[in-house]
Amino acid sequence: MSSRILTPDVIGIDALLHDHNAVLAKSASGAVAVFANNAPAFYAVTPARLAELLALEEKLSRPGSDVTLDAQLYEDSQAAPVAVPLGKFAMYADWQPDANFQRQAALWGVALREPVTAEELASFVAYWQAEGKIFHHIQWQQKLARSVQISRASNGGMPKRDVNNVSEPDDHIPPGFRG
């Protein structure tokens, strides 16, 4: 096992127990690495060195600047709903489908069990912003419905899982199996 010694002064535990005042007085830095069984066990420090270390820790724990950032920079404010443009338009970053999008998608033959997730919508908008095509609002919604249907088909009809979520075990025991 490798270890890092933070002082050039090293001594065995037996020598420290024999005369700790003399050992600490000889150390140039006010700290001695104490070894037991050829491995570092702990550090012995003089009261003066301990006071220096505590003062340094106190200094480092204070903020380094008097400048504070405004709290509103950290808050995600809800954007005001953007009115849907009339006629054909190119995709824009704040575009949203209608509130009854799932029902409309069902009328178009696309049954979505779950609402469109923010990730699915962001992916759709980013793709079509880059394309630069123009369509009516209803056509954009139809494209979104088809896009979500195709992406979910590869995942059993469900939205893609967040890779950061920890899965939970299934506690359900099917009929006919003992638990």
From Swiss-Prot:
Region (Disordered): 155-179
Biased composition (Basic and acidic residues): 159-173
Top-rank taxon: Bacteria
Gene Ontology CC annotations of this record: primosome complex
Keyword terms: DNA replication, DNA-binding, Primosome
UniProt-listed GO biological process terms: DNA replication, synthesis of primer
InterPro entries: DnaT, DnaT_DNA_bind
Family per record: Belongs to the DnaT family.
Annotated function: Involved in the restart of stalled replication forks, which reloads the replicative helicase on sites other than the origin of replication. Can function in multiple replication restart pathways. Displaces ssDNA from a PriB-ssDNA complex. Probably forms a spiral filament on ssDNA.
Annotated NCBIfam families: PRK02854.1
Subunit structure: Homooligomerizes. Interacts with PriB. Component of the replication restart primosome. Primosome assembly occurs via a 'hand-off' mechanism. PriA binds to replication forks, subsequently PriB then DnaT bind; DnaT then displaces ssDNA to generate the helicase loading substrate.
Name used for this protein in its record: Replication restart protein DnaT
Organism: Citrobacter koseri (strain ATCC BAA-895 / CDC 4225-83 / SGSC4696)
